[in-house]
Amino acid sequence: GQESPLPELPIQYADYAVWQRQWLQGEVLEEQLGYWREQLAGAPAVLELPTDHARPAQQRHRGALLSFQLSEAVTEGLKQLSRGEGVTLFMTLLAGWQLLLARYSRQADVVVGSPVANRTRSEVEGLIGFFVNTLVLRTEVAGELRVGELLQRVREVCLGAYAHQEVPFEMLVEELQPERNMSHTPLFQVMFTLQTTATTRGAATAGASQNLTVGQMGTSSGTAKFDLVLETSEVQGVLTGQVEY
């Protein structure tokens, strides 16, 4: 019978859903979709990575995980490079990942998916609900690009995607009508993530409780949604990650 000590929420999740449907239509929707039509026009249907077995006619989704950890020196070096080039750590890691994929696949046109929090308004920052959307990041890794040139190219791609992140991924697939094939996912087959939440940085353990220790525990379901997923996070100043394949 006690009143809640929590402050009143400015909006509810249902309010956001209604607002999104009302806002994402007409000229606004057309402008957002127009960007993606142009950005993804002529994109390769599949990133052909070298594998020891032929791609099955239908995805089986069997997979495994490989964990890794970078040194503190390498982590700091990546941060310094990012600051020097005026890009984020996410952009630097994405550039390296796309360059590696280009080398292995021998394809200069590399498309990678990446989830985005999609909490672009202050009213929803503390609201419980699923706002995550998936962005399609396409970078041309052609020619003898210098590191700085590649980073600036990736930066431009990311900023354009962030500015047009309101279109739900499912709507984008429906609009673009990519070639559908049971052997691979549409638009991209490789994903990249960088977790930057307080929990991954270890901040959640500090001050939460002197008698409470919070840690990460690795799990593996034996499945893989995509051909490759590179998940990274920063824990106590060191980049760690895992590759799902």
Predicted regions and their residues:
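Adenylate-forming
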Residues: 1-4, 8-27, 33-42, 50-57, ...
